[in-house]
C-alpha cells in the first residue's frame, strides 16, 4: 500500500529529532488555519517547524484567565527545544479573536486601535516570559488580520 492508495501526496519526512527552525504558536480559530499555513510556506518553514495551537495564541499562554493552560505550552516548548533544537518561537495572534475577548473583556478589543494595543501587550509579555525561561531563543511576534496580512512587533 503506497501513499497513492490513501490519496496522500508524498513528502520528505525528516527525523523526529534534529535541528529545526522554529516553533509556531497560533490560535485555534478555523479562519486562521490557511493564513498561518500560507505564512509558514512564505517563510520557507515547511517541514522545519513544530507547532502549538491554542485559543488566543500568545494570549492563551500569558493571560491570567487561561492560567490552567500555561504549563502545557511551556512543557511543549521545552520538549521541542530538546527534540528539535529550535532557534526561535514565532507567535501569531490574530484580529477578531474570541479568546482575547474572554481574557480581557469587550472594551479591550472594542476597536482596531485598542485591539492592537491589547495584542501588543500580550505579545510583549509572551516575549518577556520566553526570554526569562529560554534566553537562547529568538522570539518573533505579530498580529495577523483575517486576510492574512501580518503586522510584526518587536
Roles of regions detected by a PLM:
Residues 94-96:
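Short, ordered loop/turn segments at secondary-structure junctions
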Residues 1-11, 16-22, 27-36, 57-73, ...:
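Divalent-metal-activated hydrolytic enzyme cores
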Residues 37-44:
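Short Gly/aromatic-enriched secondary-structure transition segments
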Residues 91:
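Donor-sugar nucleotide-binding helix/loop cap in glycosyltransferases
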Residues 47-57:
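A short beta-strand-loop structural module common to alpha/beta enzyme folds
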Amino acid at each position: 500500500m503506497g501513499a497513492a492508495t490513501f490519496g496522500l501526496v508524498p513528502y520528505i519526512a525528516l527525523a523526529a529529532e534534529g535541528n529545526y527552525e522554529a516553533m509556531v504558536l497560533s490560535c485555534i480559530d478555523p479562519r486562521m488555519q490557511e493564513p498561518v499555513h500560507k505564512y509558514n510556506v512564505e517563510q520557507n518553514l515547511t517541514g522545519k517547524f513544530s507547532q502549538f495551537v491554542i485559543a488566543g495564541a500568545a494570549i492563551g499562554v500569558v493571560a491570567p484567565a487561561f492560567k490552567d493552560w500555561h504549563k502545557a505550552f511551556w512543557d511543549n516548548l521545552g520538549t521541542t527545544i530538546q527534540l528539535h533544537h529550535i532557534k526561535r518561537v514565532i507567535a501569531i495572534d490574530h484580529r477578531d479573536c474570541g479568546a482575547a475577548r474572554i481574557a480581557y473583556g469587550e472594551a479591550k478589543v472594542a476597536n482596531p486601535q485598542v485591539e492592537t494595543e491589547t495584542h501588543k501587550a500580550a505579545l510583549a509579555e509572551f516575549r518577556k516570559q520566553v526570554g526569562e525561561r529560554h534566553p537562547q531563543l529568538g522570539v518573533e511576534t505579530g498580529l495577523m488580520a483575517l486576510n492574512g496580512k501580518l503586522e510584526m512587533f518587536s
